[in-house]
């Protein structure tokens, strides 16, 4: 019997672990504001991620690096007011945990205390294990992120597929096993070969959520604005657009502009 039914009033980490054991795929999407999050939470979504991708889609930056911890907390506070059923996870932004495990746990505690989020997500493997240990020791549920890690874009040199070479794939597998051993409840795998995604998912007992990691992982995540077709210039191979909101919004606003210019809005029924 599938675990995921409309009877579940609040998705928990235990539900996600059980979903993997039942081979039931996990759905995950980003949200950054109250209005969109309100809709998402009525769809049966399992996980809502307040992603540092807000730096791109909300603030217009070319990378995730500029967004601050205070900004992430502000976005997450708005989303928390709307999300009641899905598990709410918040990205730890660049600079909030790298190289300083004490700072990492302080940042994670701030996120949980000030937003009411259910969990945090953190990028990296062996190099951040001390930060992960401290965060978990504070009782904060933690999701990992391996493969293409956007906060390391300057080191990686671009947004190309990761772990194609045998030694790179082995290192990713080791990092995934380490994160599970430390106590992470799930890991995002971004832009890696589908075969490797399958191998990691089969090796680990915790759920692996893919974005460009093939169909064999335990769930999928996309950026909301991307899957709704709002950003016409962003079209990676892994993205499936479920709507064309760019043109819907553009035509709607153009229609409004013309109605105002032609004195067709408001009409008598729309006036007091």
From Swiss-Prot:
Q: Name one GO molecular function term.
A: 3-methyl-2-oxobutanoate hydroxymethyltransferase activity
Q: Which residues form the active site?
A: 190
**Which one Pfam family would you cite for this protein?**
Pantoate_transf
* Annotated EC: 2.1.2.11
Kindly report, in one word, the top-level EC class recorded for this enzyme: transferase
Q: Where are the transmembrane segments?
A: none
What cofactors does the UniProt entry give for this protein? Mg(2+)
User: Listed GO cellular component terms?
Assistant: cytoplasm
Catalysis performed (reactions): 3-methyl-2-oxobutanoate + (6R)-5,10-methylene-5,6,7,8-tetrahydrofolate + H2O = 2-dehydropantoate + (6S)-5,6,7,8-tetrahydrofolate
Q: Which UniProt keywords apply?
A: Cytoplasm, Magnesium, Metal-binding, Pantothenate biosynthesis, Transferase
UniProt-annotated binding residues for Mg(2+)? 52, 91, 123
**Matching InterPro entries, A to Z?**
Pantoate_hydroxy_MeTrfase (IPR003700), Pyrv/PenolPyrv_kinase-like_dom (IPR015813), Pyrv_kinase-like_dom_sf (IPR040442)
So which domain of life are we looking at? Bacteria
Cofactor binding remark: Binds 1 Mg(2+) ion per subunit.
**Cystine bridges:** none
Please state which protein family the record places this protein in.
Belongs to the PanB family.
Q: How does it assemble?
A: Homodecamer; pentamer of dimers.
- HAMAP family per UniProt: PanB
Biological role stated in the UniProt entry = Catalyzes the reversible reaction in which hydroxymethyl group from 5,10-methylenetetrahydrofolate is transferred onto alpha-ketoisovalerate to form ketopantoate.
Know the name of this protein? 3-methyl-2-oxobutanoate hydroxymethyltransferase
From which organism does this entry originate? Answer: Azobacteroides pseudotrichonymphae genomovar. CFP2
């Amino acid at each position: 019997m599938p675990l995921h039914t409309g009877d579940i009033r609040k998705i928990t980490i235990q539900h996600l672990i059980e979903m993997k054991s039942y081979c039931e795929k996990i759905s995950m999407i980003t949200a950054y504001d109250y209005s969109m999050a309100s809709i998402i939470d009525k769809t049966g979504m399992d996980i809502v991620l307040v992603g540092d991708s807000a730096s791109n889609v909300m603030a217009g930056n070319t990378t995730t690096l500029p967004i601050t911890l205070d900004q992430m907390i502000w976005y997450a506070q708005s989303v928390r007011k709307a999300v009641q059923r899905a598990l709410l996870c918040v990205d730890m932004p660049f600079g909030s945990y790298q190289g300083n495990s004490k700072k990492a746990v302080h940042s994670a505690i701030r996120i949980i205390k000030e937003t009411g989020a259910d969990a945090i997500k953190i990028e990296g493997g062996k190099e951040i294990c001390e930060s992960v240990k401290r965060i978990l020791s504070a009782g904060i549920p933690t999701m990992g992120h391996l493969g293409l890690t956007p906060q390391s874009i300057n080191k990686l040199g671009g947004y190309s597929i990761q772990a194609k070479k045998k030694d790179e794939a082995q290192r990713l597998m080791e990092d995934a096993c380490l994160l599970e051993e430390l106590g992470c409840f799930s890991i995002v795998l971004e832009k890696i070969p589908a075969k490797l995604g399958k191998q990691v998912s089969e090796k680990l007992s915790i759920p692996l959520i893919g974005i460009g990691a093939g169909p064999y992982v335990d769930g999928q995540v996309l950026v909301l604005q991307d899957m709704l077709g709002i950003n016409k210039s962003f079209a990676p191979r892994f993205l499936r657009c479920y709507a064309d909101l760019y043109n819907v919004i553009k035509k709607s606003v153009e229609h409004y502009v013309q109605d105002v210019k032609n004195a067709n809005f408001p009409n008598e029924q729309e006036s007091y």
